[in-house]
Structures are given as C-alpha cells and as structure tokens.
C-alpha cells in the first residue's frame, strides 16, 4: 500500500489542490480530515465530498465544536487571554485541536505523514509543526504551500489544469480563517495600513450604528471561572459563545483592527471579529476584579499575558503553559457571580456586578453612615508606607 498522508483539510483552494498535487507528484494517498469548529459557511458534508472529488482516498469530518469550546475557548476566557492586549487568539487556539485530531487520524488510518496548507510567512506553520513534534514526533510533516512556494495564481492554474472541482477567483481579495470563537481577515488592500476596512470585510458583526436605538443588556453568570448562564438561563460554554456572538455581533461589538507582531519576526495587519469572545473575556475580567485578592489579581495579570504569548507562539503543549494553568485553576476557586453589561454601538459597558464571593465590603468602602473603616489607622500606615522613599530622598538631597 502507498504511504498515506493525513491532510488538514479546510475545503478551500490550497488544501484542495494539495490533495491532487500530493497524489500526482509523490504517489502517496491522501486522507483528508476536516474539523468542525463552528466556523459555519459550507455544510461539512459538502466539504467531505469535495475532498473525495479532489482525489482523497478517504475523507473524515470531526465535530469538535463542544471540545473546542470546553477545552480551548474556556481556558482563553479564564486566562483573560488577549495577545498584545487586543487579539483573543481566534486562530491560535484552534491549531492545537486540529493537530490532536490529525495525529489521531494518522494512527487510525495508517498515516506516516501529516500535512498542512500553511505558508512560510505565518504563525500557523509553527503551531502545527510544534504540535506534531510534541504529540507525534515520529510523523513526517509535509507543507507543500510553503516548501514549494505556491502562490494563489499557481494554485488556481494547477486546479484548472487538473480539473479540480473548486470554484475560485484570482480577484478574491482576502485570506479568511473562522471558527465559533471568531473570524480573522487579512491580505488584499488591508495590507496597506492606511486603508480602512470596507463593509465586505465583516461577516460576524453588524455596523455598530445599525441598532443604535436598541442597546442590549445582558447578564453573564460564572461558576469558578466558567460561564454557566446568560440572563439567568443555564448555558454550555459553546451555547454562551454562540448566543453572545449573535447578540453582541448585532451591536457591532468585537471588531478589532490590529497590527500584531508575528512569531516569524514581521508585523501583520489583521481584522478580527470576536463578539462573543470579547464579551466573555470582559465579563470574566470584571468578575475577577471583584473576587480576587489584590496581590493575586495583580500577579495573575502577568500570567494572563504570558499564557496568551505561549499560545500565540504555538507552545500549547509546553510545560510552562501546563504549570500556568495549574495556577489559574487555583485562582478560579472564588470566581463565581454575575456581571451585567450593555452592548451598544460597538462597545461593552459593564454596569453591574454581584457575587457571594465578592471581596467588596460596602461598610469599609462607603463614605456615608455605617462606615466601619478605622481612619485613625491611616496616618501610621501612610508614614510607614512612604518611609523608604523619604529616606532615599533625604540622601539624594545632600
């Protein structure tokens, strides 16, 4: 039997061409694996059949929506993960899950090679290949788009010459990646930093002015850092993301225009849409402000940033990430309560917080009757707190 290549298949141009190219140029069989991460668009059965029509000996569809939400989106929420304080890791968190299922498919279908359709300029090649090296170092990796310098024009020409059944146009301006956590758009005229995004860039969000007269107030409930309810009704993590995608998206919430530092050393402009993600991260962050002790909250802000960097850099399976998550599990013991927000005009405005685990003490905080704060203790505290600065200043003024 010929060697088998297990291909991460999206249904798009590059991976459809890859099926035919691998067969013709290397004589290997291709098993196409398409992962449903809630990306919507084409029916997954249509994508599966396209892989077969392109020459795959087998085509597998994996419904990983709940797994993605519980195992990948949820840690992103609990870590308040925003790379460069902006990007909620839309694509980055999906790659390790795809890697996991490709490795499983290789074991099941007798594959000795795994393949992806990434270019040599992006982060995803790193995420895929570091993931493969971590989970299955025995598997060979094939990256035809990168290793053979495919361009879009070359891929289209190959598709036409070999009657590959896929509808494409050389004028299609954008590169798009999407899943239930969000949508990423790049290339085309967006590569010129002064060009503003046009309406056709967006699909998950409405124009922020469209529903200007009808703001949406929403209450998100958490238990130990896990979103469990919306407006008092129980939801799964996936259900929370999907509902907030719809509601926040209708208010234009979650649009991000970002110039980010890629792992490969270049800067790249990306347009992201992540309405549900931004609402959940905002709500979770706010609940931590209420329930985490000051020093713990201050330190966790550092680990949140480091976790986001590790995931962005393709180190999902790293020991440091695993250690940080053990720390975060401990921090979430008291992150239980509800956050109320108004979604309006592209913005998220928090206007209410309640938690049985709150560290906010009304009697200590109030300036009105009932104040229990012992203000007589403040004078000595201020003296001791500023003593080291006072001594240093006295020395410097000699």
Curated annotation (Swiss-Prot):
Enzyme class (EC, first level): ligase
Binding site for L-aspartate: 119, 123-124
Binding site for ATP: 8-16, 117
Highest taxon in the source lineage: Bacteria
UniProt keyword annotations, A-Z: Amino-acid biosynthesis, Arginine biosynthesis, ATP-binding, Cytoplasm, Ligase, Nucleotide-binding
Pathway noted in the entry: Amino-acid biosynthesis; L-arginine biosynthesis; L-arginine from L-ornithine and carbamoyl phosphate: step 2/3
Subunit structure: Homotetramer.
Protein name from the UniProt record: Argininosuccinate synthase
